[in-house]
Amino acid sequence: LEGRTVVSFASNDYLGLTAHPVVQAAAIEATTRWGSGSGASRLVVGSRPIHHELEDAIAQWRGADAAVLFPTGFAANLGLLATLGGTGVVIHSDELNHASIIDGCRMARANGAAVHRYRHLDLDHLATNLAANAGARQVVVTDTVFSMDGDIAPIDELASLCAQHDALLVVDEAHAVLEPPPEPLVNGAIVVQVGTLSKTLGALGGFVAGPRSLIDLLVNRARTYIFTTAPSPADSAAALAAIRVVQSEEGAALQQRLRQHIARVAPGHPSPIIPVILGDEGSALAASQRLLELGLLVPAIRPPTVAVGSSRLRIALSAAHTDDQIAALVDALRMLETDGGQ
């Protein structure tokens, strides 16, 4: 960074697969075979065998009937929610959901859907909203792991509520590197998964996995699928190779190493996203700068990304971090605590 070597605690490369030799080799081979880009949308001439192979692998990995690729995870949420939205549809969204879900809900509203936000992880509030809209076609959408706090949605309880009110449950699995995929049917509720290829898998792209009928609908209706160039062969091949690593003994070992890192930095925390909430923007910026002086890149997150008064350091851990790097981070955080964040 600016001529200095620093250790990044800002990347979403949770398992370190962007640098995995098998993943890199797959991208190179795909580029040599199919070219650097797809050249067109999937419904014109942009589809390559690697796209279909990856979609099949995602469906198998996620335990779903089928899956469809999008250029990014952001585009996947936009395409899914805009397609689900329409007159007579009510979408219920956690207030701390990712921006892609928020914008997808806006597109759904433009298509005639009603959108209600429920308080963060407040199942009673959600239950009240669901009951108030009985008779409508209802959708509940949530992050599985929330991107700023690193906390986890109670999928089983959400599914029970959805089953009770005949609602579809959509879960954004973007940051869910340590949790097993939800089943297609949880406590009687149909579960649709949205995911990204850019975090756990170290590539670029997004997907929706769910019932075959929904995937077919998205292929024919989702504008962020139809009217955009297909994902590159390199990214698709890299993601496919990464899935195979994740499903192997090596993948399990990487996940266990990540769990161990989390336990050293924040015992009991459920995800590799660890917030250090400092309150005001100045304190967060000063703490980030102090860590940078120590060779540790930890970003300060401020409004409007987070609420006023909750500015923070956002630590993102990776299995690629060494034990010494984790030790340096722990020591630096203790120093900040002793110095009052300055």
For the regions a language model picked out, list residue spans one by one.
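Short beta-strand-to-turn element immediately C-terminal to the catalytic PLP-Schiff-base lysine
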Residues: 17-18, 179, 186-187, 195, ...
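PLP-dependent enzyme catalytic core of the Aspartate aminotransferase-like
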Residues: 17, 21, 29, 33, ...
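Conserved PLP-binding catalytic core of the aspartate aminotransferase-like
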Residues: 252-295, 305, 309-313, 317-319
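Active-site phosphate-binding strand-loop segment of PLP-dependent enzymes
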Residues: 115-171
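Conserved N-terminal alpha-helix of the aminotransferase class I/II PLP-enzyme fold
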Residues: 25, 30-73
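PLP-dependent aminotransferase class I/II
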Residues: 196, 200-269
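Conserved PLP-anchoring active-site segment centered on the Schiff-base-forming lysine
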Residues: 80-99
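N-terminal "arm"/small-domain region of PLP-dependent enzymes with the aminotransferase-like
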Residues: 1-36, 167
